[in-house]
Amino acid sequence: MNLVQLGKLHENVLDAGCEPNRNARYLASLGYKVVGIDISERAISKAIDKTSSEKSNVNFNQRDFSRLNEFKGHFDTVIDIGCFHSILNSDHEPHTASLSHICHSDSSVFLRAFSETNKSRYRRWQGHKRYSLALKRNNVKKLSL
């Protein structure tokens, strides 16, 4: 993961849409405290099974990203690799609004989404521009793309 090599990640990490959980497990192996969430109960069960024999700093939770206000405390880093561009338009606002509950003023949000400039590839998927606009509407001040 290049973000590690670039020194962009900080202690407490949320991996949103964590299946297949390799990022969460990798970051935990490096000493980061990681919470991996996915809306899929099956994905979380598989992640827990994979890590049950490992001693690591990762916890997996089956959770809808729009309900992150249920978490206590804040995350220093949020990683969204392919989660946002696969949700419905009607879920954009709750998805991004939840970030304001879990991020503090120095938190970083990293997003990998389909580019809106290549419409033949993303079709119905949502791109980074929509994510950026939704974050601004929800007062998330810092955004790393």
From Swiss-Prot:
One of its GO terms (biological process) is methylation. Keywords: Methyltransferase, Transferase. Gene3D superfamilies: Vaccinia Virus protein VP39. It holds the Pfam family Methyltransf_25. CDD domains: AdoMet_MTases. SUPFAM superfamilies: S-adenosyl-L-methionine-dependent methyltransferases (SSF53335). One of its GO terms (molecular function) is methyltransferase activity. The keyword Methyltransferase applies. Its EC number is 2.1.1.-. It is an enzyme of class 2 (transferase). The keyword DNA damage does not apply. Belongs to the methyltransferase superfamily. Probable methyltransferase. This is Uncharacterized methyltransferase C977.03. It comes from Schizosaccharomyces pombe (strain 972 / ATCC 24843) (Fission yeast).
